[in-house]
Amino acid sequence: MSKKLHIKTWGCQMNEYDSSKMADLLGEYQGYTLTEDASEADILLLNTCSIREKAQEKVFHQLGRWKTLKDKNPNLIIGVGGCVASQEGKAIKDRAQCVDIIFGPQTLHRLPDMIEQVRRGDKAVIDISFPEIEKFDRLPEPRAEGPTAFVSIMEGCSKYCSFCVVPYTRGEEVSRPLDDIILEIAQLAEQGVREVNLLGQNVNAYRGATHDGSICSFAELLRFVAAIDGIDRIRFTTSHPIEFTQDIIDVYEDTPELVSFLHLPVQSGSDRILTAMKRGHMAIEYKSIIRRLRKAREGIQISSDFIIGFPGETKEDFADTMKLIEEIGFDHSFSFIYSARPGTPAADLPDNVDMEEKKQRLAILQDRITQQAMRYSRHMMGTVQRILVEGPSVKNPMELRGRTENNRVVNFEGLPKHIGTFVDVEIVDVYTNSLRGKFIRGEDEMDLRRSLRPAEILAKRKQDDELGVTQFKP
């Protein structure tokens, strides 16, 4: 009988990535298979997020539900990871006696060892340290699950915005070596991945060591990734305006693999609030970045993050945010009402904005962004869009689902052979959260760059050597 693993994940895309690595780690080294049913699992892992208010209480409520499962099965192992574990490790140990393992984002690679400690009788094994980039050296080889993949290029953040817990829960910025990233992406490309999304709390702060001891910038990394055979699209998230430098903007001008879509959080359009947030830039500097981006890449679309009701936010401050939204023409946003995070400088500021006022402002902002997004979508009517087909449609499995460069989901009638490839579709209808497409042509009719996968290169070398025609020279 196979051993079962259940993972519940809350929070950002980095957490989703970490959870997938936990599954790979325990699957390869200990033979666990994933299950959606917590009641049949031998190990339960909760990967937590501390960004939103009452994150800790949400964790304890979930652990209370899992405790009933452990009461029935004393051999059940329960682990808590992620940012709440980093922040509240001792509190979890004290309040939730059912928890066996507490680990941070940087120590998930030690899970097999921690599980063995529990099996030997140790109680509440805790490891929430920050051992820099060690975890990537201990993870199994990447495994593709479809034509798109996430690849972590760095961990942590050193910006210390006044509202944010990330530097305290994930540590300061640490970049992975260039060669490790390129190898992982090449392995994914060999498995059929066509699009990679480079992950980090602040990806444009990437400074990775190279094999010769020099440092690779984020702009240089983007060009290296674009040169990998099989990779035809590159996305990245998340970035910070103060390090969105001209060399990164230049990549948009000469690297077509980099999509015409950027998520660049601004949080507020008010200079006064940006200063209180310790963002390190003003609204005019953000607008300058977007202006230069649109000069380098015509038609690029921008999404952002907004915090509504930050302590001291006045009606004038909010008006500045709405003005910025109109000037930039954001296509999408992640917008939230401010919630104080314990241990951050902003938590000590007087929260003097009425909650009803916050809710009204949030509704106004989200309504404006939705209007702008629909306007962009309507402009796509009748155009031909190149999409990467990711799989069957969510609502109708007899149809296919793909994604445009500007991150819109398109559903269309097509053949299963198109999954994992690019197709051109004409946009024939527009909905709030998706588009409707009509199939025009498949990849075999496109003028795409000919990709030579590593296996083909090796086969060609072997054939040439056997024939004595050529000799491979690196």
Curated annotation (Swiss-Prot):
Locations listed in the record: Cytoplasm
Binding-site positions, [4Fe-4S] cluster 1: 12, 49, 83
Domain Radical SAM core: start-end pairs: 143-375
Segments forming a coiled coil: none
GO cellular component, one term: cytosol
Cystine crosslinks: none
EC numbers for this chain: 2.8.4.3
Gene Ontology molecular functions: 4 iron, 4 sulfur cluster binding; metal ion binding; N6-isopentenyladenosine methylthiotransferase activity
Residue span, MTTase N-terminal domain: 3-120
Reported cofactor(s): [4Fe-4S] cluster
Residues where [4Fe-4S] cluster 2 binds: 157, 161, 164
Cofactor-binding details, from the entry: Binds 2 [4Fe-4S] clusters. One cluster is coordinated with 3 cysteines and an exchangeable S-adenosyl-L-methionine.
Residue ranges of every copy of the TRAM domain listed in the record: 378-441
Keyword Metal-binding: yes
Catalytic activity field: N(6)-dimethylallyladenosine(37) in tRNA + (sulfur carrier)-SH + AH2 + 2 S-adenosyl-L-methionine = 2-methylsulfanyl-N(6)-dimethylallyladenosine(37) in tRNA + (sulfur carrier)-H + 5'-deoxyadenosine + L-methionine + A + S-adenosyl-L-homocysteine + 2 H(+)
Role: Catalyzes the methylthiolation of N6-(dimethylallyl)adenosine (i(6)A), leading to the formation of 2-methylthio-N6-(dimethylallyl)adenosine (ms(2)i(6)A) at position 37 in tRNAs that read codons beginning with uridine.
Family named by the database record: Belongs to the methylthiotransferase family. MiaB subfamily.
Subunit structure: Monomer.
Protein name: tRNA-2-methylthio-N(6)-dimethylallyladenosine synthase
Species assigned in the record: Shewanella sp. (strain W3-18-1)
Name of the gene this protein is made from: miaB
